Amino acid sequence: MYYGFDIGGTKIALGVFDSTRRLQWEKRVPTPHASYSAFLDAVCELVAEADQRFGVKGSVGIGIPGMPETEDGTLYAANVPAASGKPLRADLSARLDRDVRLDNDANCFALSEAWDDEFTQYPLVMGLILGTGVGGGLVLNGKPITGQSYITGEFGHMRLPVDALTLMGFDFPLRRCGCGQMGCIENYLSGRGFAWLYQHYYDQSLQAPEIIALWEQGDEQAHAHVERYLDLLAVCLGNILTIVDPDLLVIGGGLSNFTAITTQLAERLPRHLLPVARAPRIERARHGDAGGMRGAAFLHLTD
C-alpha cells in the first residue's frame, strides 16, 4: 500500500492507495503548530493506524508547501512552522523504520496528474498551478524533476518577457514579488493577479470569482479583461514551453475552474512558440483536493 500525506498549515491529510493507484482510505487531522514533537506524533499515529487497518507496512510519501534544503529533508516551510528547519525526512524515516520520501506540494500535484490513467501515455508532463500563487512541477517518465534546490517548476518567479510588455504597454508596472524580485509573473497570472489586472485597468476592486461571474453574464468589460489575461498567459507560457516542450500541460489551482483558460489557451500559444514547435495537449487537473495525497503516495512509484 502507498501512503500519501498532504500537509498544510491547517491539516495533515493521509490517503492510502493500492497497487492500482485507487484511494482506499483517508483521514485528516489538524496540523500541530507549536511543537515539532507533536507534529511527528501526528504523522506517526496516522501511519500506525493505516498499518493496522490494512495489515501491511505501507510506503510513506509526504507533500508539503516547502522546499527540502538538505539530503536529510530539512525544510523551509513557512506555512508549517512546527516542521520548518527540522530534518523531517530523516526523523520520520527513523521513527517509522521505512524510507520516507518528501517533495514540495507543487511537484506532488504534477506527479498525481502524470499518473492519471489516461495521462501515463505522455513522457513529459508539466503541471501548472494558477491559484493564490503560480507554481507547478515537471514529471519525466513518471518521475518528478526537482533540481538541486527543489525549485524546478517555480514558474511564477520567471519575469515578464518583453512580449508581455509589448502587449500590456511598456509603462506597465513591474510589481515587487514576495521573493524580492520585480516583475515575477505570479503577480499577474495568479488569482490575486487576475483581480489586480482588473483593478489596474478599470479601477474597480473585484475578486476573481466576481469577475468571472460578470464574464459569464456577457459583461463587455469582463470579456475584454479575460481576453487580455489569456493573451498574457499565452505570452508567458511561450517562454516556458519553449524551454520545457512538454507533451501535456495540466492546469490546476482555483483559476483552473474557469473553463475559458483550458478551452481558449491552445489557440493563442502557437504564435509565441518556435515555428516547428507543437503546442502540448492542455487539460484541467482531474484529481482536485486528492491530488496532493496521490502525488505524495506515488513518490514511491518512481523506483
UniProtKB/Swiss-Prot annotation:
GO biological process: N-acetylglucosamine metabolic process; peptidoglycan turnover
Zinc as UniProt keyword: yes
One protein family per Pfam: ROK
Residues that hold Zn(2+) according to the record: 157, 177, 179, 184
Pathway: Cell wall biogenesis; peptidoglycan recycling
GO MF: ATP binding; N-acetylglucosamine kinase activity; zinc ion binding
UniProt record similarity statement: Belongs to the ROK (NagC/XylR) family. NagK subfamily.
Name of protein: N-acetyl-D-glucosamine kinase
Source organism: Salmonella heidelberg (strain SL476)
